[in-house]
């Protein structure tokens, strides 16, 4: 038995494989199981071309055998096996893929699904082992061979004894240290967990001897342990089954099994795409919002599989942020993986899949809004805010994608309505889509600014979330109808001539009020929108009063202020008191003006700038 050196730069490359390529030790089992699956696939392919051979799938499986006494973990398969030459060529040369070589030699086209691509997966065993022993017998061969290496000083190949074709890979685990407990890879629960996590959908049974408990024969309460071989993996993934044969319960159970959520999802999508891109997917729209959804801890992403093998637990590239609530899986053979299969190469295929998924989700939501309004409103209650963030984010790049999914509470319908539904009901003479901003529907209904719009019979949309107005400002218009806040300076329904006349007739008192308030407001003018209230605040420019409130509450705010206009109802009896005070008692006039301004602030939900001064003014008024 001679000692053989790894070929060419293989020794250095092996060190890179062990220490640099793989970032997660536990994937060694995924790699070795995938290799075992490929080996069985090769037997199947051999039998296709030889009528004298048969392939009974029930005879083929992968066995995982931990040995705690010897601290070894064995992965066995009933696969194609290797000759002495193949052992030397495949395991003596790092990064030579025996699977790819097999495809070339047998002129196999891409339809034959072999997982291995790079020829390094076997060496991931050195992540947890300081020695690897391989005992193998090639399909149709008489002799078996043993390959052995410590991953440092080359390897040896010698003849061995093995009854049937296939391969046993024996990992001699490293000694435990302060940082790593390698013994955990001998524990039944850990092995089952890794198989379910990474290799649940390998097409052949993965078997493990499992310790179970039962009532001892002849007793009532005495239990005994026994060992039973158990198939751990599911084998046939749900997404590869005929969707016409699946029930809602099948999808719901899968949702819970994958721990996407513990309640029933609101909707599921089973997608199978072939063509320029090929992938299978099952996507879920949750009914309830995850507890951490609007926190930094939440991670979006779909489980990503390649040929049924888990590559990434959360592939964020497959979902835009505004659809980050979607759960599910994607399986594709067309992905360009990096050498460790832990990460993706950024390529067109991934982008195409992501684009296709985005379209599928949008279509599903539009269908839900149209055909199952009750379910859509449940969804929107949980995730509507995220859609509105999507409109606002990235400088409005996605606004056209999302605008038809938005809904707001309607003053006329007393329920949530879409923008399309609002526009369809607009009066012929109505120029704008009107909205009001407030902390709640009840608060908005008491706003003095709504009076004139409602008197015209126009509908008002209620914006009660902090993102609402920011999203609409980014949207700007819908079906060529501009959005207009009821608190804006010009509603488009006032009589310009009457306004001009009112402002000219009361120019003196308005100038005096502006002088009393100073820089707190940009102007005082007559209001045509008020009926029952003496004053209200409106705004001019891009920043509304509500936006000022939101921005001022943010850390490191830049002191952004709305240009506030104090509008005065010249038909209100308080206005007569103001005129009298201006003529007879300027101090009282200034007091009235300040009180009216503070009243307008309170109605808007804004803080009074000087509460002590305000209470003193009230006391003066009561003397």
Curated annotation (Swiss-Prot):
Chain segments carrying region B: 342-549
GO molecular function terms noted in the UniProt entry: ATP binding; ATP hydrolysis activity; ATP-dependent protein folding chaperone; unfolded protein binding
InterPro entries, sorted: HATPase_C_sf, Heat_shock_protein_90_CS, HSP90_C, Hsp90_fam, Hsp90_N, Ribosomal_Su5_D2-typ_SF
Places the protein is found: Cytoplasm
The protein's assembly and partners: Homodimer.
Role: Molecular chaperone. Has ATPase activity.
Species of provenance: Clostridium perfringens (strain SM101 / Type A)
Region of interest called A, as start-end residue ranges on this chain: 1-341
Region annotation C: where it falls in the sequence: 550-623
HAMAP family documented for this protein: HSP90 (MF_00505)
SUPFAM superfamilies, per the entry: ATPase domain of HSP90 chaperone/DNA topoisomerase II/histidine kinase (SSF55874), HSP90 C-terminal domain (SSF110942), Ribosomal protein S5 domain 2-like (SSF54211)
A GO CC term attached to the entry: cytoplasm
UniProt name for this protein: Chaperone protein HtpG
Originating gene: htpG
Source organism, top-level taxon: Bacteria
UniProt KW keywords: ATP-binding, Chaperone, Cytoplasm, Nucleotide-binding, Stress response
PANTHER family documented for this protein: HEAT SHOCK PROTEIN 90 FAMILY MEMBER
Similarity section: Belongs to the heat shock protein 90 family.
């Amino acid at each position: 038995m001679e000692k053989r050196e790894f070929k060419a730069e293989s020794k250095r490359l092996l060190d890179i494989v062990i220490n640099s390529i793989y970032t997660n030790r536990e994937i060694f089992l995924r790699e070795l199981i995938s290799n075992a699956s490929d080996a069985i696939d090769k037997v199947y392919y051999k039998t296709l071309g030889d009528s004298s051979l048969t392939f009974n799938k029930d005879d083929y499986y992968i066995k995982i055998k931990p040995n705690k006494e010897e601290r070894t973990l064995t992965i066995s398969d009933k696969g194609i096996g290797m000759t002495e030459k193949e052992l030397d060529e495949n395991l003596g040369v790092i990064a030579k893929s025996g699977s790819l070589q097999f495809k070339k030699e047998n002129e196999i086209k891409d339809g034959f699904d072999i997982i291995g691509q790079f020829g390094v997966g076997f060496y991931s065993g050195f992540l947890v082992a300081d020695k690897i022993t391989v005992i193998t017998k090639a399909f149709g061969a008489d002799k078996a061979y043993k390959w052995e290496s410590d991953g440092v000083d080359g390897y040896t190949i010698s003849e061995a004894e093995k009854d049937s074709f296939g391969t046993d890979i024996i990992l001699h685990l490293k000694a435990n240290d302060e940082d790593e407990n390698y013994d955990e890879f001998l524990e039944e629960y850990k092995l089952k967990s890794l198989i379910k996590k990474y290799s649940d959908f390998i097409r052949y049974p993965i078997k493990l001897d499992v310790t179970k408990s039962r009532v001892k024969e002849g007793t009532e309460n005495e239990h005994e342990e026994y060992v039973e071989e158990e198939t751990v993996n599911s084998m046939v993934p749900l997404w590869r089954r005929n969707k016409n044969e699946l029930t809602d319960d099948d999808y719901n159970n899968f949702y819970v099994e994958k721990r996407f959520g513990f309640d029933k999802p609101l909707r599921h999508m089973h997608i199978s795409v072939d063509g320029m891109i090929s992938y299978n997917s099952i996507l879920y729209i949750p009914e309830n919002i995850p507890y951490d959804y609007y926190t930094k801890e939440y991670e979006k992403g779909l489980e990503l599989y390649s040929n049924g093998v888990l590559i990434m637990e959360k592939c964020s590239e497959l979902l835009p942020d505004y659809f980050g609530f979607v759960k599910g899986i994607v399986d594709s053979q067309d992905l360009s993986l990096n050498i460790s299969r832990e990460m993706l190469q950024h390529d067109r295929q991934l982008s195409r899949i992501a684009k296709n998924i985005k379209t599928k989700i949008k279509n599903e939501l539009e269908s839900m809004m149209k055909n199952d309004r009750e379910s859509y409103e449940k969804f929107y209650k949980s995730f509507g805010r995220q859609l509105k963030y999507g409109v606002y984010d990235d400088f409005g790049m996605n606004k056209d994608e999302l605008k038809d999914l938005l809904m707001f509470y309607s003053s006329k319908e007393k329920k949530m309505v879409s923008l399309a539904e609002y526009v369809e009901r607009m009066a012929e003479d109505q120029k704008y889509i009107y909205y009001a901003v407030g902390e709640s529907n009840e608060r908005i209904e008491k706003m003095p600014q709504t009076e004139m719009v409602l008197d015209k019979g126009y509908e008002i949309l209620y914006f009660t979330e902090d993102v609402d107005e920011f999203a609409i400002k980014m949207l700007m218009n819908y079906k060529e109808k501009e959005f207009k806040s009821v608190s804006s300076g010009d509603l488009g329904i006032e009589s310009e001539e009457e306004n001009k006349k009112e402002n000219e007739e009361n120019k003196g008192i308005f100038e005096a009020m502006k002088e009393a308030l100073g820089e707190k407001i940009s102007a005082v003018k007559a209001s045509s929108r008020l009926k029952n209230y003496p004053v209200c605040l409106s705004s001019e420019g891009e920043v509304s009063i509500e936006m000022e409130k939101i921005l001022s509450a943010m850390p490191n705010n830049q002191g952004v202020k709305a240009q506030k206009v104090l509008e005065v109802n010249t038909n209100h009896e308080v206005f007569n008191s103001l005129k009298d005070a201006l003529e007879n008692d300027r101090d009282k006039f200034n007091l009235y003006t300040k009180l009216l301004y503070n009243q307008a602030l309170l109605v808007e939900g804004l803080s009074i700038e000087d509460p002590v001064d305000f209470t003193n003014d009230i006391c003066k008024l009561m003397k």
